[in-house]
Amino acid sequence: MTSVSARQIDAIIERHAALQARMATGDMAPADFVAASKEFAELEPVATAAREVVRLREELVALNEMLADPEMKAMAVEEIAAVEAALPAAEHDLALQLLPKDVADSRAAMLEIRAGTGGDEAALFAGDLLRMYSRYADTQGWKVEIISANEAEVGGYKEVVASVSGQGVFAKLKFESGVHRVQRVPVTESGGRIHTSAATVAVLPEAEEVDVAINDSDLKIDIYRASGAGGQHVNTTDSAIRITHIPTGLVVIQQDQRSQHKNRAKAMQVLRARLYDLEREKLHSAEASARKSMVGSGDRSERIRTYNFPQGRVTDHRINLTLHRLPEILEGAMDELIDALIAEDQAQRLAGLGE
């Protein structure tokens, strides 16, 4: 386990106290007060964890000194055991607080689900995944808004893009990127044979205009008449938008809204998220040699999870976790899965700090 030095702990506590004292004076410019308040709030849980480590370490020193007193020795031995049992957990909690934060963790996310191998069954599975994430979002108090959807004739989706907004969305959904595989007997299968299908999930942190500089000269915008399933026109105006980002070749098509203006706004929302994600991928690649985390790799071609209907199980291959709760998970009971992925990522990053 990575141990936090006494010097680091002192620096944390001193900085927290200094910020508190400075804000209490009332002699700060509004902008400075806002900045100090933000830093103070971010430092609060770290300082609390640091003080708990200090308390336990000091208590351990005092108890060890009591061992020299014959009358106090028995009690001291018992209390030393209790403190020694509590200290590693407190130090672990502090180390977690000190891990570098992903600046995107607090952001909303763009959720993209695409049917892969398996034809109609893959499209139905893509629909099941959207429902699973939507139900999970409900349990978290998040809002899900469909940005664009290419529905399959049999049901489900060939491709669907949704915006998920709320507290800490990306932090919890970011490990969902990858290939999700389903094994089940399709409703159209008369012989009872199990088929394997797949869908690809991409979770991108939503980006603000200030995050990504997009020059109008870098965009090629095509406007045309929107069409629905089978090619029929869904309205009589040229409202569909196709935006091509020339430097990267990224293409976003948006036709779900009747208003050209709304379609353009949503297309730009998706484009910003994809460009921001590209920048994050470059940064991740640069850090890859320093941090070999399978959980956080974000490789969207990697098979990450299997949903096996005959056995009623869900297996996450990255952490070798199998849960025999498939119906509940598909209804949004994803906490156990997501918490396990977050814990494994934290463990790997802590191990990286200790190397």
From Swiss-Prot:
Cellular compartments per GO CC: cytoplasm
Pfam families registered for this protein in UniProt: PCRF, RF-1
Stored SUPFAM superfamilies: Release factor
Location (main, coarse): cytoplasm
The entry's keywords: Cytoplasm, Methylation, Protein biosynthesis
Post-translational modification: Methylated by PrmC. Methylation increases the termination efficiency of RF1.
Gene3D superfamilies reported in the protein's UniProt record: 3.30.160.20, 3.30.70.1660, 6.10.140.1950
Domain of life: Bacteria
PTM sites of type N5-methylglutamine: Q232
Molecular function GO terms recorded: translation release factor activity, codon specific
Compartment(s): Cytoplasm
SMART domains named among the record's database cross-references: PCRF (SM00937)
InterPro entries on file: PCRF (IPR005139), Pep_chain_release_fac_I (IPR000352), Pep_chain_release_fac_I_sf (IPR045853), Prokaryotic/Mito_RF (IPR050057), RF-1 (IPR004373)
PANTHER family: LD18447P
Family from the record: Belongs to the prokaryotic/mitochondrial release factor family.
Protein purpose: Peptide chain release factor 1 directs the termination of translation in response to the peptide chain termination codons UAG and UAA.
Full protein name: Peptide chain release factor 1
Organism encoding this protein: Sphingopyxis alaskensis (strain DSM 13593 / LMG 18877 / RB2256)
Gene: prfA
